[in-house]
């Protein structure tokens, strides 16, 4: 069974992937859905517009800086933590039920 969706590790990869899919005479999203991860502006300028998960980069930076400062100030008591940062789904034109 062929795949129904490709999830790219970043939005920029989609720009190359879309050309490869089109070279096989496949239509996006009719034959294959595509999803990215970044939310960069370029993803909304391409055709079709990419459905992507926009990262909370500002929040990631703030949390990373806070944790780094904690490790520097308290090197013996710093604890490794798992931090979760939300994102935002930007609905484009590259996903449909197949």
Each language-model region and where it sits:
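Flexible loop/turn connectors
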Residues: 1-98
């Amino acid at each position: 069974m062929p795949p129904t969706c490709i999830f790219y590790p970043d939005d920029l990869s989609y720009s190359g992937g879309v050309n490869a899919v089109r070279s096989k005479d496949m239509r996006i999203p009719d034959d294959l859905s595509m999803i990215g991860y970044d939310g960069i502006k370029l993803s909304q300028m391409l055709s079709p517009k990419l459905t992507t998960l926009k990262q909370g980069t500002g929040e990631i930076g703030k949390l990373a800086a806070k944790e780094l400062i904690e490790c520097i100030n308290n090197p013996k008591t710093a604890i490794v933590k798992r931090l979760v940062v939300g994102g935002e789904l930007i609905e484009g034109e590259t996903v449909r039920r197949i």
